Amino acid sequence: MIDLQGYGPRLLEGALVTLEVAVLSLLLALILGLLTASAKLSRHWLFHRIATLYTTLIRGVPDLVLMMLLFFGGQIGVNMITDWLYYEFDVDIFININEFIAGVVTIGFIFGAYMGETFRGAFLAVDSGQLEAGRAYGMSNRLIFRRIQFPQMMRHALPGLGNNWMVLLKTTALVSVIGLSDMVRIAAEATKATHEPFLFMIPVAVVYLLIASVSEWIVARLQKHYNVGFGEADEWNN
């Protein structure tokens, strides 16, 4: 392992933290994205309005501002609630929100909106006639979703999901501003102590590039999997 003036092991730990934040944020964003897409496609006006407000908020407010608002505002809100609950007992309780959890929730919340738009477009791209044909054959809604809608939806969604993941990966650098010791924060601390920015920032850039390269390979494999059979079908249609 490269020692990097004693900061090598800490940078490796920071890289693992960055990867954990990215993966967990992605999982949360995918869940929120599916819920948002379902709400936007719903005929229920309230669900549609809430989803529209959510995506508009995320598009209009910078990620860094949202990170600060959710972390510090959430901490203030939680402590206000505990003060109210324990007011009669004259107990002073102060709760610190974990930086890791705050980072995952914030990034997942931000990218849930973008994933929602990606999923919505992908669902709309699936031919509704195929869904009607599935119902005509007596298939349940769950089976139609699993066998017909989901595979075709993923075919259309994967390029957008891959792009969102790449942006999400780079956005994880923002967690350093709330005190989480990811590799960006550790590299910044090492730079401040040694006055050698390139010695630490270049390895950080290399790690991000490695993760991005592996991610591109995974997305390409998934696209190949979900595109099986569609090339031949397109040739027949032409």
Which positions does each model-derived feature cover?
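Transmembrane alpha-helices and adjacent helix-loop boundaries
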Residues: 1-238
